[in-house]
Curated annotation (Swiss-Prot):
Organism field: Vibrio cholerae serotype O1 (strain ATCC 39541 / Classical Ogawa 395 / O395)
GO biological process: respiratory electron transport chain; sodium ion transport
Chief location bin: membrane
Entry keyword Cell inner membrane: yes
Catalytic activity as recorded in UniProt: a ubiquinone + n Na(+)(in) + NADH + H(+) = a ubiquinol + n Na(+)(out) + NAD(+)
Transmembrane segments: 11-31, 39-59, 77-97, 110-130, 140-160, 176-196
Localization in the cell: Cell inner membrane
Gene it is expressed from: nqrE
Protein name as annotated: Na(+)-translocating NADH-quinone reductase subunit E
Family under the similarity heading: Belongs to the NqrDE/RnfAE family.
Membrane topology designation: Multi-pass membrane protein
Self-association state and partner proteins as the record states: Composed of six subunits; NqrA, NqrB, NqrC, NqrD, NqrE and NqrF.
Example of a GO MF term: oxidoreductase activity, acting on NAD(P)H, quinone or similar compound as acceptor
Amino acid sequence: MEHYISLLVKSIFIENMALSFFLGMCTFLAVSKKVKTSFGLGIAVIVVLTISVPVNNLVYNLVLKPDALVEGVDLSFLNFITFIGVIAALVQILEMILDRFFPPLYNALGIFLPLITVNCAIFGGVSFMVQRDYSFAESVVYGFGSGVGWMLAIVALAGIREKMKYSDVPPGLRGLGITFITAGLMALGFMSFSGVQL
């Protein structure tokens, strides 16, 4: 149990997808204007990561891993296309659920919801799972923790950006300029966790 708690904390803070690996920056910067929208996208990312990492773990271990289906057959060259297909299917299902049951959130997320399919944070989580050879249980914890870490980062950035509307930002830095600086300072703050050994 202690191993899973340390993996969860590690994936949220120490190996944060957005602020340590800089994955998923396109939606991270574009959707972080309002806390409410950022929170909704963060929840969607948590759901997709929590489901796609373990599902892709099963697909990899049962089908794609060398000698998984038949001894001597290595289908690992199909990793990328298979993982993207699984992620796309899960995002499509999530999109239909949000459209049916949460129309305001679906409309607020707009084009960014289908973009979760190609969000490199999602694909990064799946790739790290394969690279680190996580078990099924570890992949569930890692997927959930990575999603929570990404949501924590985007909601924090959105909160800061909402407060910056009332600040005296120099004209040359307004918009994405000050957002990049803020994200960089947040990443420096999260770097302080890198010395923690779990």
